[in-house]
Amino acid sequence: MLIERSAKAQLLYYLQHFPAVVLLGSRQVGKTTLAKSIFGLTGKPMVFLDMELPSDFEKLQHPEIFLRPLKDHCVVIDEVQRAPALFEALRPLIDEHRVPGRFVLLGSASPSVIRGASETLSGRVAYLELSPLSLPEVQGYFSWRDHWFKGGYPEVLLTPDLPLAQDRLQQFIRTFAERELGALGQEVTPPLLLRLWQMLAHHHGQMLNVQELSASIGMNTRTVNRYLDLLEGGFMTRRLLPWYANLGKRLVKTPKIYLRDSGMLHTLLRLTTPDALIGHPACGASWEGYVVEQIIRTAGPRWDYHFYRTAQFVHCSARSGSASRSRA
């Protein structure tokens, strides 16, 4: 089953106006499938390279030699964070033949990808984030109940056997903690990262208290903050900042923390069935996070998202505001 992604139209739009597009999102979210779905729609021959394949990685050890003859192609480079030096090589190639739609760069870790692209490809690149499947995207295929409980990762959602679906998420979590960050040059202690991740699941939808997390896990606050940045940069968590325009001291300025995928949240909480979720104390927080995430995924990046909370603790999650207007 191939579910049409709402980001497809935006990707094609960017390729008509920018020399390069960086498509960001966590692993298994559907970036490769989306990129391959535009083959034949760009008006150019397309070449696909995967930096996890030794043969493709070798081709780009001297990128100018391989890529210069492809100036009239659209070149898709998957897992580009594996080759951060590539950004520097792309800049002169783009400037030599500056036309829209030359490169699509797929990345699974935003800090390294954005840092490399922003420093070297400024003015040449557009960014597009791909989240797990949103509720509007799966309507007609899955109920909102299934989507809420299993989350939006395509392979998980398309797995009819619930224990197998959760096993896929467990493997995803372990792989991210034990292999992915290390492969990107990040020094982490996987058991501690997993403990923090599970602790965040129990604090889902709450105000982020780094000192409390540090004391509970036995990690110093500096390490906790670094791990929080890695989880957020890997698209696993989201910090929702407070809205405080014109409200001064009445507002609490600490962010709220959410796990971005509801299925991953339920797996970390060891909730194995929808009935177990409904009877669990975390049900309300899970639903809040699910609604917040659907609002953000559906409304898109042109809004800023905040929660509103006064000293009397009356609050409205996911207040979105642009430069000239706001909605609650």
Residue ranges with predicted function:
Residues 111-126, 142:
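Short regulatory helix/loop adjacent to the ATP-binding pocket of P-loop NTPases
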Residues 31:
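Conserved lysine of the Walker
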Residues 1-12:
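N-terminal pre-Walker A segment at the start of P-loop NTPase domains
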